[in-house]
């Protein structure tokens, strides 16, 4: 196989929990991935998009001067043609690949539409069993348990709440427990034909989530855990090395995540690249911000890698710490929910300030689609706050400013040459400067 066809097959004030390290990725295309889940084994953005492989600290595959004649873009297109030439080669990180239908409850592969929602057999059976048995559950925690394929059995209460939240219909379950063909749903009677019915049935307090929000929720990557190098003594080098590795691994997931945004794969390959190259740091910082919401004046760079002000000062990250903390406080004040967080990530990507957009009309359509989805969500879930969508959108300029500070800081770290950087992170830095 030619190189062009290659593809993706922390001390003071911080603490490291003894958690398992973050998996490299669930995608088969990461077969050439390094064990740590970083991007150096096959090259950075080039690995994801099919470019020539290089090791750590080698010259970047592209500069930030534009996309014309960009070898990264050429390899991106090679990736799309290679999948047509050889069906055995799966370019899983090709951004215009069509994602499989996922269960909106747990993220497993959906077997079809059950009770009005794309869902897997396990969640379908769980919902049916709960309704037929009239079972009531209670959450031992705070009714906010994460429901994934691996953890869907850990909390039945939160799993059932998730079923209802994504739109599963109770009336779709046969209460007589009789097996048979599909149940026929009759159209609801008009109120004038059945005034009694209109008096007895009241609308639910909250409507099911919009499809776009549901898709974004199930597309969220697994939780991220730090992997501090054991052979580096405690200090600024170890902290920066850990953060650079975390960023590199998150970028790998980010490329996969982007193709699950409805409408994103309709853009040209060049525009997909432009948006990612422009907005990646904003998306990463949003992740840090959301993880940090439960803490007081601390930043959660990963689930198990948390820095306070003193540690940030010792490792030279005090200015960046204060900038990100400003965002954390702003989102805390807004009491941002996870549904809003995933929408903001998608909007940050679509609202990129890239100068190299080929089809502005198509990008504008994507922006309009996501803006409308946010508005619909806020109207259905937060109707008592009619200006909430606007307040959330007004946080994006501060997010962009903070991302610019982060890029400049890590680029200066790169120029010093003391901290190793994996290919993907290195190349994305080059694209932003």
UniProtKB/Swiss-Prot annotation:
CDD domains xrefs: NR_DBD_ERR, NR_LBD_ERR
GO molecular function, one term: RNA polymerase II-specific DNA-binding transcription factor binding
Domain spans labelled NR LBD: 208-432
Region annotation Essential for ESRRB transcriptional activity and interaction with NCOA3: where it falls in the sequence: 203-433
Record's protein name: Steroid hormone receptor ERR2
One of the protein's GO biological processes: trophectodermal cellular morphogenesis
UniProt region (Interaction with NANOG), positions on chain: 93-211
DNA-binding region extent: 100-186
Matches recorded under PROSITE patterns: NR_LBD (PS51843), NUCLEAR_REC_DBD_1 (PS00031), NUCLEAR_REC_DBD_2 (PS51030)
A Gene Ontology cellular-component term: nucleus
Signal sequence coordinates: none
Compositional bias ranges of the Low complexity kind: 32-41
Region named Disordered: 1-41
